[in-house]
From Swiss-Prot:
Belongs to the cation transport ATPase (P-type) (TC 3.A.3) family. Type IB subfamily. The chain crosses the membrane at residues 90-111, 115-134, 142-162, 164-184, 311-333, 342-359, 655-674, 679-698. Residues 739-760 are annotated as: Disordered. It is found in: Vacuole membrane. Mg(2+) binds at D599, D603. One of its GO terms (molecular function) is P-type cadmium transporter activity. This is Cadmium/zinc-transporting ATPase HMA3.
Amino acid sequence: MAEGEESKKMNLQTSYFDVVGICCSSEVSIVGNVLRQVDGVKEFSVIVPSRTVIVVHDTFLISPLQIVKALNQARLEASVRPYGETSLKSQWPSPFAIVSGVLLVLSFFKYFYSPLEWLAIVAVVAGVFPILAKAVASVTRFRLDINALTLIAVIATLCMQDFTEAATIVFLFSVADWLESSAAHKASIVMSSLMSLAPRKAVIADTGLEVDVDEVGINTVVSVKAGESIPIDGVVVDGSCDVDEKTLTGESFPVSKQRESTVMAATINLNGYIKVKTTALARDCVVAKMTKLVEEAQKSQTKTQRFIDKCSRYYTPAVVVSAACFAVIPVLLKVQDLSHWFHLALVVLVSGCPCGLILSTPVATFCALTKAATSGFLIKTGDCLETLAKIKIVAFDKTGTITKAEFMVSDFRSLSPSINLHKLLNWVSSIECKSSHPMAAALIDYAISVSVEPKPDIVENFQNFPGEGVYGRIDGQDIYIGNKRIAQRAGCLTDNVPDIEATMKRGKTIGYIYMGAKLTGSFNLLDGCRYGVAQALKELKSLGIQTAMLTGDNQDAAMSTQEQLENALDIVHSELLPQDKARIIDDFKIQGPTMMVGDGLNDAPALAKADIGISMGISGSALATETGDIILMSNDIRKIPKGMRLAKRSHKKVIENVVLSVSIKGAIMVLGFVGYPLVWAAVLADAGTCLLVILNSMILLRDEREAVSTCYRSSTSSPVKLEEDEVEDLEVGLLQKSEETSKKSCCSGCCSGPKDNQQK
């Protein structure tokens, strides 16, 4: 696929190629040897399961067609993949295979007319040319692949005057190879659909001209009509609409966008007209990074794959030597029935190609990674996928992960008679303007709502203390804002902190304001749980996974969250510093493989310590995204158990593929040893095993069959299905109308349990 990801200074372009000649990982070195000798190729990578080669090259030195020519000189059957190809081409077998098959069928009529037997030889000649070309290319590189082994089997059967079997070998091998290529191409279509999400054209709002997205710079205003895809990441500067973000986040419901809302490339404007000011170049958009991440993951090898590849290096030589022994030793011993032993040697020889076994892991991994990516669950490496299937403990951060991080100030007070509330709020909001914590935005919004204008320019020496709070110097005063621990930072003994928490119970997050060592103010913050958290925790428990919550918030706030989740969490730790979270993760890892889910700076050490770290891609900080092994593209925690089930299914498919590839070849060899050495069956088993492995792995690309939920939530006019006695409670999770209504709850628990004290 000639993809327009160019660097003007270096004239670089990324091109994608379908390379049918890649059967398994053993061909990767062949591709490498070819491309390293081509002038202008800067870097390349090979994705074996989809038979894809990705090449970054200088367009002034070499074109995609010249790269195709170089690959085809090695008989790799390469072609340029059109950009974002998403349709499956109906392709017939090669003319060689068709002619060979017709002649083979006609040769079976030899029992009625004996001269037709010679048509089998013609069938061999007609169909053997593609096999011969690939076999010669393989031998010249001092390798014995399945084409070379099959050619040896064909020549040997011809020498034994078994013409019909020779023709059968050629025809079955050609058809199986065609079916295998078609299946691999079908698997690659899903990956191609990811790359074609973002449109290639954008309309400049000022002029109405349509230009290539690669020519659109940052801060350019583009227009997007209803029904069109947003071309580049940006911010809405005019208009409003509903946007379908399912392609990136997996979120089924439209998201409302107004002025200053962030929008992403490849999402669809469902209604309305908007103008978007771009905030990134096309190559730096979320969808581009997402595609790159998936490609990198698919190129990576799992531990299982590395082990199988290592074993396969010794498998083929050992089998070839064994086949030679079965052919030579009977001759030396002057055994009478040499034909049987020669056929047995050929069966063993054809079984010497371990392609099916080598493909068993990467194809399943490829399909699982692709399916996860299309669901908004980005897994960075194959090893992460393997580890994900073995997780025993999942730890969650609270703020921004379990809860929405949409704080609301419920109480702000000055505790010093000499400082009025207006002045204190001005100090706090000015300092918080320099912080990226979700609580900071709530304090700023509260200040603006009471007509206090933050002035970040007056803040000096701003400092952030993870797990504690922030500091800033204003008007010659040292101001500290944070939780209990900030008191020690301010020089105030915690024992001297007034017990103001008694009036701030019921799960509210409490903040303190110090001027020097003196406590001068306090505030309360309210936060609610995300939709679906309780349901996700129950699903994890059904998978036999233990859940925990790690938070730097106070004990009351932590226990209030636990109550909202109907005590779904197994373990709750509160008032933790970032290093405390990392230490607890170490303790969990002693019990079993551990996963950490977080979204902020305070989670980075714990994410790094865990066997698997999941960062929230939409709400998460840049550091958390880099630290995490998996990126959750939306804030829907329910994708985590879904991703874990996919990982377990992938692990199961790998085992099935290994058993399938070994057992089929084993069965053919057993038949040979007990007196039925069928060479054509051995050829069919070898090529057929690869096909079965691919088809079995492609089951992972299907949607997982899920039970119909009793409760549905929608941001549009979609129907809501509740139990009959709960029809009135249509605003589950919002402020309840009465005490009677508040006692009712959503039947599935997807709205996070009891709804007491939740805010609209």
